[in-house]
From Swiss-Prot:
Species whose genome carries this gene: Chlamydia trachomatis serovar D (strain ATCC VR-885 / DSM 19411 / UW-3/Cx)
Principal localisation: cytoplasm
GO process annotations (BP): prolyl-tRNA aminoacylation
GO molecular function: aminoacyl-tRNA deacylase activity; ATP binding; proline-tRNA ligase activity
PANTHER family the UniProt entry points to: MITOCHONDRIAL RIBOSOME PROTEIN L39/PROLYL-TRNA LIGASE FAMILY MEMBER (PTHR42753), PROLINE--TRNA LIGASE (PTHR42753:SF2)
EC class: ligase
Enzyme Commission (EC) number: 6.1.1.15
Protein name: Proline--tRNA ligase
NCBIfam families: PRK09194.1, proS_fam_II
Record's keyword terms, sorted: Aminoacyl-tRNA synthetase, ATP-binding, Cytoplasm, Ligase, Nucleotide-binding, Protein biosynthesis
Record-linked SUPFAM superfamilies: Class II aaRS ABD-related, Class II aaRS and biotin synthetases, YbaK/ProRS associated domain
Outcome of mutating P354L: In strain: E/UW-5/Cx
InterPro entries: aa-tRNA-synt_IIb (IPR002314), aa-tRNA-synth_II (IPR006195), aa-tRNA-synth_II/BPL/LPL (IPR045864), Anticodon-bd (IPR004154), Anticodon-bd_dom_sf (IPR036621), Pro-tRNA-ligase_IIa (IPR002316), Pro-tRNA-synth_IIa_bac-type (IPR004500), Pro-tRNA-Synthase_IIa_type1 (IPR023717)
Effect recorded for M3T: In strain: E/UW-5/Cx
């Protein structure tokens, strides 16, 4: 492709909303333009990157028996109502909802578990057809409250989603392992640093679940890693530091604490460390339009993990109650809630079990108690694991070795769903006894745009984008000084030769200085530059420089040999951009 014909434009200034590097560079380099908040138009440059990314995905999924399908973006509410997810998604206000001319409720697809389950239910006639692995690569929609970070959190985005149906839990696990390995190969081909971590399934399902995270400083997710084991901080099992508490139980005392509401204030007021203070938080659950409130006690030096609390309470999710809700239901202000005389069900984290003579609130404004003890002053509660893991906590899955904490961008998520969806849609087969058996389902997804944005966050430098060779829009840029007629003639000849052989050259034929062209090539993230400079006239050698700065010289006669060893050939995979006369 000639740059003079390419539909693109670089920009010195990014959109004011470009708060992250990936969004800023994609705009500056002319890869995308903002259509509306969270909605973007892609230029031919970015479309080529996406085509290469999706080609890698197809190759790896086809290699394990995946079959590509196309599922509808417009989905009837009645399918979602069968699984109970219509109300759940509506409550989060993330669905794009509309009605057809018959007044039937529809949504724009955020995911396809319901649709594919109904699809397979119509097709499946016997056990011998299993396992089956269907996948698609298409657009998804989420009405994000705060779309931000460019492709990291958009309202419209591209995803690969796979669905497997099996005849048994064992076969489901086999399919899970195959997809997991295929996803690893996909990210390995991008040369990304990533980790696979245990995760919570959220609203999709409560079975086995893992996330793939690309490590980068921007990462919205906190990842706990110990040796080869990793987990999202919300799912990480951890052993926090333990402390020795008093064995001599002291008489409980009420202490006036005017306007002393926070753990930090209590630490100073009582001159005692945080781990000797009991912190009580009120959480709210909402199941079948019924709100319930619970008190959760944790050590004062730790943070609550609402995902673990929801799992303990056997609900889909929960949230911290607002100050208004606390005042309405407990008749006490936030900051003075405690397990003493608590009017709602109360549970405590395991790390609070050995605490003695601790400080806590007693549900009276401006009053706390000290020397409080379980069993004597407060009935012994049910205990559970309610803590967020932290750096230095010990990992039970890695022999008690400590966790390290990293930031990551979630780029893929894999789930074992069991029979949650297949039961709702009666997806099954008859066994040898004539009894109906349900299929066991798995769901898997890669965020294509998020993965490419994560590539940028991890690999970009102060010059611009740095695309992995596997997905770069062009492999090599041919550069010469504008106005150099001999250099232009050589460049055109080399361009035609490389183009014929399928090596995807980009010819910068603009009438610009060589230095200007070099900077643009770096900004675009093209892996290699083929430079026809002053030295070519004296030595007859071409200079090749990689995006990382490594240089070598080759003769025009040996250029194709160098390309065959260093560049991918995309003669059949990616259609060339059409050129004009």
């Amino acid at each position: 492709m000639r740059m003079s014909l390419l539909f693109y434009r670089t920009s010195k200034n990014a959109n004011k909303e470009a708060s992250v590097l990936s969004y800023e560079l994609l705009q500056k380099a002319g890869y995308l333009f903002k259509t509306s908040k969270g909605i973007y138009s892609y230029t031919p440059l970015f479309q080529r990157v996406i085509l290469k990314m999706t080609e890698i995905i197809r190759e790896e999924l086809n290699a394990i028996g995946g079959q590509e399908v196309c599922l509808p973006l417009l989905q009837p509410a009645e399918l979602w109502e069968k699984t109970g997810r219509w109300k759940a998604f509506l409550s989060e206000k993330l669905l794009y909802v509309l009605k057809d001319r018959e007044n039937k409720a529809m949504c724009l697809a955020p995911t396809h578990e319901e649709v594919v389950s109904e699809f397979v239910a119509q097709w499946l006639t016997g056990r011998e057809q299993l396992p089956i692995h269907l996948y698609q690569i298409g657009t998804k929609f989420r009405d994000e409250i705060r779309p931000r970070f460019g492709l990291m959190r958009a309202k419209e985005f591209l995803m690969e989603d796979s669905y497997t149906f099996s005849d048994s839990p064992e076969q489901m696990e086999e399919q899970y392992a195959k997809l997991r390995l295929a996803y690893q190969r996909i990210f390995d081909r991008l040369n990304l640093k990533y980790v696979i971590v245990a995760a919570d399934g959220g609203k999709i399902g409560k079975g086995k679940s893992e996330e793939f995270h690309v490590l980068c400083s921007l990462g919205e997710d906190t990842i706990c890693v110990s040796g080869s084991y990793g987990a999202n901080v919300e799912a990480a099992q951890a052993i926090p530091p333990s402390y020795v508490y008093d064995s001599n139980l002291l008489p409980v005392e009420e202490v006036a604490t005017p306007n002393i509401r926070t753990i930090e204030d209590l630490e100073v007021f009582f001159n005692t460390p945080k781990h000797k203070i009991l912190k009580t938080l009120v959480v709210k659950t909402c199941q079948k339009d019924s709100e319930k409130f619970f008190a959760i006690c944790i050590r004062g030096d730790r943070q609550i993990n609402l995902t673990k609390v929801a799992s303990f309470l056997q609900v889909d999710d929960c949230e911290l109650a607002s100050e208004e809700e606390i005042l309405k239901h407990l008749h006490v202000e936030k900051g003075f809630i405690g397990p003493l005389y608590c009017p709602i069900p109360c549970y405590a984290d395991e790390t609070t079990r050995p605490m003695t003579n601790f400080i806590c609130a007693n549900n009276q404004k401006d009053v706390h108690c000290k020397h409080v003890n379980w069993g004597r002053d407060i009935p012994l509660p049910a205990f559970g694991d309610f803590l967020l893991a932290e750096a230095g906590d010990l990992c039970p899955q890695n022999g008690g070795a400590p966790y390290e904490i990293f930031q990551g961008v979630e780029v893929a998520h894999i789930f074992n769903l069991g029979t949650r969806y297949t039961e709702s849609f009666s997806v099954g087969f008859q066994d040898k006894n004539g009894d109906k058996q349900l299929c066991w389902m798995g769901t898997y997804g890669i965020g294509v745009g998020r993965t490419l944005a994560a590539c940028i966050e991890q690999l970009a430098d102060n010059k611009g984008l740095v695309w992995p060779l596997a997905v770069a829009p062009f492999s090599i840029t041919i550069l010469y000084n504008g106005g150099d007629t001999e250099g232009e003639a050589t460049a055109l000849q080399l361009y035609q030769s490389l183009n014929t052989e399928g090596f995807e050259p980009l010819l910068d034929d603009r009438n610009e200085r060589l230095g200007f062209k070099l900077k643009d090539s770096d900004l675009l993230g093209i892996p290699y530059k083929l430079i026809i400079g002053k030295s070519f006239q004296s030595t007859g050698l071409l200079e090749i420089e990689s995006r990382s700065g490594e240089k070598c010289n080759v003769s025009p006669e040996n250029l194709l040999d160098w390309c065959s060893k260093n560049l991918p050939c995309h003669t059949r995979k990616i259609p060339p951009l059409r050129e004009q006369n």
